[in-house]
């Protein structure tokens, strides 16, 4: 995998962030959080919900469900930011 190519996880999170798609995040303890992804890195996701920000560690996340389908192809290389090498 080249340095400028995103993995599927990053492509998905980046698209829901850029398109401002609401998500439901299920944690491994069964708790649910609903909101909008504002940022992420290798270890955490920042979720904005009801005017508050939550930093969620990725190892605590079980599932992320977007409110509508997300096209991860665009984020993986179908746009000018991430061209295939």
Curated annotation (Swiss-Prot):
Which residue numbers delimit the Sm domain?
10-70
The name under which this protein is listed is: RNA-binding protein Hfq
The gene for this chain is hfq
Q: Which organism is it from?
A: Carboxydothermus hydrogenoformans (strain ATCC BAA-161 / DSM 6008 / Z-2901)
Tell me the lineage of the source organism.
Answer: Bacteria, Bacillati, Bacillota, Clostridia, Thermoanaerobacterales
Q: Which GO terms describe its biological process?
A: regulation of DNA-templated transcription; regulation of RNA stability; regulation of translation, ncRNA-mediated
PROSITE patterns, per the entry: SM
Does this entry carry the keyword Repeat? no
Tell me if RNA-binding is a UniProt keyword of this record.
yes
Q: Which UniProt keywords apply?
A: RNA-binding, Stress response
Please name the NCBIfam families in this protein's record.
Hfq, PRK00395.1
Coiled coil regions, renumbered to chain? none
* Quaternary structure annotation from Swiss-Prot or TrEMBL: Homohexamer.
State the family it belongs to: Belongs to the Hfq family.
Q: Name one GO molecular function term.
A: RNA binding
Q: What does this protein do?
A: RNA chaperone that binds small regulatory RNA (sRNAs) and mRNAs to facilitate mRNA translational regulation in response to envelope stress, environmental stress and changes in metabolite concentrations. Also binds with high specificity to tRNAs.
Query: Which GO cellular component does the record give, naming just one?
Result: cytosol
């Amino acid at each position: 995998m080249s340095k400028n190519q995103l993995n599927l996880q990053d492509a998905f999170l980046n698209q829901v962030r850029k398109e401002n798609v609401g998500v439901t995040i299920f944690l491994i303890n069964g708790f649910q959080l609903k909101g909008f992804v504002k940022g992420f890195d290798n270890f955490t996701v920042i979720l904005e919900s009801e005017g508050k920000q939550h930093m969620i560690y990725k190892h605590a996340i079980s599932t992320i469900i977007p409110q509508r389908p997300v096209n991860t192809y665009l984020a993986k290389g179908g746009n000018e930011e991430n061209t295939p090498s």
